[in-house]
Curated annotation (Swiss-Prot):
Swiss-Prot/TrEMBL GO biological process terms: translation
MF annotations from Gene Ontology: large ribosomal subunit rRNA binding; structural constituent of ribosome
Organism for this UniProt entry: Bacillus cereus (strain ATCC 14579 / DSM 31 / CCUG 7414 / JCM 2152 / NBRC 15305 / NCIMB 9373 / NCTC 2599 / NRRL B-3711)
Keyword RNA-binding among record annotations: yes
Name of the molecule in the record: Large ribosomal subunit protein uL10
Keyword Cell membrane assigned: no
Pfam families reported in the protein's UniProt record: Ribosomal_L10 (PF00466)
Family recorded in the similarity comment: Belongs to the universal ribosomal protein uL10 family.
């Protein structure tokens, strides 16, 4: 096998592994972004723990078929970049959606969330969800509320008895 074929096969394997391992994968069309805008987008994604790469569509198609995500192939036309997140399902959708609001040149095409193909509308809906940390803080506040209310009620009763005794 030629050196070029080996290199392409390694890239296909790399993409397929990333598709299988990622909890959230978003495909975007970055045509029209300036270099500074693309750099800013990469920085924001990196800070969110998201990997952002540009691959040839033909190699990405082979990798998607290898990873049993062939339905993604219909969105692989034109210049595409792919955002992979192994940690947070919401992070790539949130960062890309927020960036696309300010920069019309960035077009979200589709994504794969936990192995399921999602459309542009679903990606936008996912982007509105709070992050994992936000959900955990909401859960903790819900769990603490009854205890806090009990403590306040007990304190109010104690204060009332103290006033009656004085």
């Amino acid at each position: 096998m030629s050196k070029v074929m080996e290199t392409k096969q390694q890239v296909v394997t790399e993409i397929a592994d990333k598709l299988r391992a990622s909890k959230s994968t978003i495909v975007v069309d970055y045509r029209g972004l300036t270099v500074s805008e693309a750099t800013e987008l990469r920085k924001q994604l990196r800070e969110a723990g998201v990997e952002f790469k540009v691959y040839k569509n033909s190699l990405t198609r082979r990798a998607a078929e290898s990873a049993e995500m062939a339905e993604l192939n219909e969105f692989l036309t034109g210049p595409n970049a792919i955002a992979f997140s192994n940690e947070d399902v919401v992070a790539p959708a949130k960062v890309l959606n927020d960036f696309a609001k300010d920069h019309e040149a960035l077009e979200i095409k589709a994504g794969v969330i936990e192995g399921k193909l999602v459309t542009l509308d679903e990606v936008k809906a996912i982007a509105t969800l709070p992050s994992r940390e936000g959900l955990l803080s909401m859960l903790l506040s819900v769990l603490q509320a009854p205890i806090r209310n009990l403590a306040l009620a007990t304190k109010a009763v104690a204060d009332q008895k103290e006033e009656q005794g004085a």
